[in-house]
């Protein structure tokens, strides 16, 4: 749930990058941190867990105007994808306003993607949130690895596995090269702000 800071005239939204372990969530955030450094306030905080990390930092989206005369600040988080960090993932989702689900395009990761999406749905439900109503964007990461002859799933296959019911916006990407990273983030921020404006109108 977005936080209103009336003193600073600021609205803070929280966007979480979710998905299977080693799928590219951290790489997405690291790319954003480097590429959009002028729009970032403060440092990137990294909490190391064995074989994975939880990252977060504040991002100021430019050119998106104001809501109710307030500036917008977005907090970007990743969650550790490994199965054993279920409690951490659930904790990071608390108060979430928008989600980027980073799916791994490698053929061998097909099951992991589907399990992670189910895990997301379950954790959201425990907070009283519906995966079909939360602003959600999918990114099909590691598309560049096809050039190296590594077997990838087709976009059609990934859409069928993950997005047949959700019908969420989806972007092919390569987080290491930055392909699709900005588009994914921009779409998620816009969807999140639209949902927030709707919420505020209901609250009048």
Each language-model region and where it sits:
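Canonical P-loop GTPase G-domain recognition
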Residues: 144-202
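Conserved beta-strand segments of the P-loop GTPase G domain that flank and frequently precede/overlap
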Residues: 76-78, 100-104, 137-141, 172
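Inter-motif core of Ras-like GTPase G domains
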Residues: 86-108
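Conserved G1/Walker A P-loop phosphate-binding module
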Residues: 2-48
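Conserved nucleotide-binding/hydrolysis micro-motifs of P-loop NTPases
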Residues: 22, 82, 106-108, 142-146, ...
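Switch I (G2) and immediately adjacent beta-strands of P-loop GTPase domains
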Residues: 45-84
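Conserved catalytic network of the ASCE P-loop NTPase/AAA+ motor domain
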Residues: 8, 52-55, 65-70, 91-95, ...
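Conserved C-terminal guanine-recognition region of P-loop GTPase G domains, centered on the G4
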Residues: 105-165
